[in-house]
């Protein structure tokens, strides 16, 4: 796994595990790889994966059955989506709008970009309620 300098490795691994849960690779109430197995997969020290698993346990995305291993919590997908939406709406989106303003990017330019990535007019204008 290639890591970015701008974010802690254990958080990048947590994001990867959450992606894998969302994609159905690890269903709810099913076991995920052991710390050592996952450390080997992402090529990091096992202590980094321990920190990742502790972090995900704190978010109630996974839980530990002592002596058996780590399992995906019931409702983990919904929890991940909720956390990611919150981060997007309260951190990523405000930063995006600050950048638009700083770089003086017009709505016409945004509209052109949306057309390039094939987001149709009705989708763009629809309000989410």
Residue ranges and their predicted role:
Residues 1-6:
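N-terminal intrinsically disordered/low-complexity leader segments
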Residues 10, 34, 70-85:
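Short, cationic-aromatic polyanion-contact patches
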Residues 26, 30, 58-67, 71-74:
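Beta-hairpin "wing" of winged helix-turn-helix
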Residues 31-42, 56:
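A short alpha-helical element within helix-turn-helix/winged-helix DNA-binding domains
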Residues 76-101:
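Conserved segment of winged-helix/HTH DNA-binding domains
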Residues 117-123:
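Conserved small/polar residues in nucleotide/adenosyl-binding loops
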């Amino acid at each position: 796994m290639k890591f970015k300098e701008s974010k802690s490795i254990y958080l990048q691994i947590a994001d990867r595990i959450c992606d894998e849960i969302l994609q159905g690779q690890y269903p709810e109430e099913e076991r995920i790889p052991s710390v050592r197995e996952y450390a080997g997969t992402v090529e990091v020290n096992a202590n980094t994966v321990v920190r990742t698993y502790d972090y995900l346990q704190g978010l109630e995305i996974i839980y530990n059955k002592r002596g058996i291993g780590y399992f995906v919590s019931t409702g983990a997908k919904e929890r991940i989506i909720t956390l990611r939406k919150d981060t997007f709406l309260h951190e990523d989106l405000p930063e995006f709008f600050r950048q638009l303003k700083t770089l003086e990017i017009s709505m016409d330019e945004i509209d052109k970009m949306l057309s390039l990535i094939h987001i149709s007019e009705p989708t763009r204008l629809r309000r989410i309620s």
